[in-house]
Amino acid sequence: MSPPAGGAAAAADPASPVVLLAVQAAVRLLGAGHEDEAQLRKLQLKADPERPGRFRLGLLGIEPGAVSLEWPLESICYTIRGPNQHELQPPPGGPGTFSVHFLNSEEAQQWAALVRDATAEGQNGNDSTAPVPTPAMCPTSPPCSSVTPTPKATQPEMDLPQGSGNLKKEELATHLAQAIAGGDEKAAAQVAAILAQHHVALNVQLLEAWFPRGPIRLQVTVEDATSVLSSSSSAHVSLQIHPHCSIAALQEQVFSEFGFPPAVQRWVIGRCLCMPERSLASYGVSQDGDPAFLYLLSAPREVSGHSPQHSKMDRKLGCLFPQSLELPHNLQASSSSLPSPPQPGWSCPSCTFINASNRPGCEMCSTQRPCAWDPLTATST
């Protein structure tokens, strides 16, 4: 793109000491088609070395190959559309009006104040002794003709960028996190709108600092749902965990320490059947000694017999529940030929806990009793 009329290519030395302020914003041409994507650009205001008391506004490219533009400040029309939304109209013959969307509300306010002061200073004449405005100056002077704030009643809705090809998604995500942490609702909403418009997939998680401190000891009652002695096949273990860990991470820890695959684990904490993606803290785990229940379900067996994984699991079950291995040999032999005794109550379809027959819901996870379960039929069998 060639430099617009009344302007010139930006200076090659961005570290010049005359630069007053440089900020980043998402910039695109208004009136262009949707194929014209917003680009992350740097807005720069500096003193004009050839004209004391005057200033130049630059629109600098950040990515390799991007064209940088620059105009005398008095030759452009700069309009403030909203807290984070501005418009920049170069002199006639230029590329057209630019939509400028700031990612940071504080930078937007600082930039607008500096442009107002610099414009007012430039209108006072070419006096070389005039003070140069700084970013710390307050916008006490009234808006000049070339920096026009839009009245609140007529402010249009935020003009979001139409593309995401040149937007740095990681920077936008960082700005979103900073805005939320700083309590800046407007900035957070605007950045979130840009990310949502371009369907950017995010993984929003709390920082570990917001969780209770760890590690702590979780007291786990393990129930073996596969044992014929289900009423007495329980064991107690202590696990060292962090409250910010997810249930999925806890399942992997149990798999690593005891060999029980996550597929056979059902965790119940605080009378809730735990979901893998939620944290332990979300179920109230915060201090040493907090209780949890782990139910071990029966895993599907291969047609050819036990797999090495099942053999390992059986050995671990034997260590946790030694009483199941101390049955008399004749009882073990007869148990295979005799039908199993009827289970009192009904089995929860979610956590497999055996509930009393008169309970309408599961005592552990509050799941409703299956409608198909009939206490008379269960007793007769």
Swiss-Prot record:
Major site of localization recorded for this protein: cytoplasm
Entry-annotated residues carrying Phosphoserine: 307
Summary of the tissues where the protein is detected: Expressed in brain, spleen, lung, heart, skeletal muscle, kidney and testis (at protein level). Expressed in heart and testis.
Zinc finger (RanBP2-type): 342-371
Listed Pro residues bias regions: 132-142
Biological process terms in GO annotation: apoptotic nuclear changes; defense response to bacterium; epidermis development; keratinization; mitochondrion organization; negative regulation of inflammatory response; positive regulation of canonical NF-kappaB signal transduction; proteasome-mediated ubiquitin-dependent protein catabolic process
Compositionally biased intervals (Polar residues): 121-131
Key words, A-Z: Cytoplasm, Metal-binding, Phosphoprotein, Synapse, Ubl conjugation pathway, Zinc, Zinc-finger
Pathway: Protein modification; protein ubiquitination
Residue ranges of domain Ubiquitin-like in the record: 216-285
Gene3D superfamilies registered for this protein in UniProt: Phosphatidylinositol 3-kinase Catalytic Subunit, Chain A, domain 1, Pleckstrin-homology domain (PH domain)/Phosphotyrosine-binding domain (PTB), Zn-finger domain of Sec23/24
Stretch list, region Disordered: 121-153
UniProt cross-references to SMART domains, sorted A to Z: ZnF_RBZ
Cell compartments where the protein resides: Cytoplasm; Synapse
Any one Gene Ontology cellular component term annotated for this protein: LUBAC complex
Region (Interaction with SHANK1): 172-305
Region span, Self-association: 1-177
GO molecular function, one term: polyubiquitin modification-dependent protein binding
Function: Component of the LUBAC complex which conjugates linear polyubiquitin chains in a head-to-tail manner to substrates and plays a key role in NF-kappa-B activation and regulation of inflammation. LUBAC conjugates linear polyubiquitin to IKBKG and RIPK1 and is involved in activation of the canonical NF-kappa-B and the JNK signaling pathways. Linear ubiquitination mediated by the LUBAC complex interferes with TNF-induced cell death and thereby prevents inflammation.
Domain notes: The Ubiquitin-like domain is required for the interaction with RNF31.
Subunit: Monomer and homodimer. Component of the LUBAC complex (linear ubiquitin chain assembly complex) which consists of SHARPIN, RBCK1 and RNF31. LUBAC has a MW of approximately 600 kDa suggesting a heteromultimeric assembly of its subunits. Associates with the TNF-R1 signaling complex (TNF-RSC) in a stimulation-dependent manner. Interacts with EYA1, EYA2, SHANK1 and SHANK3 (via ANK repeats).
Protein's name according to its UniProt entry: Sharpin
Originating organism: Rattus norvegicus (Rat)
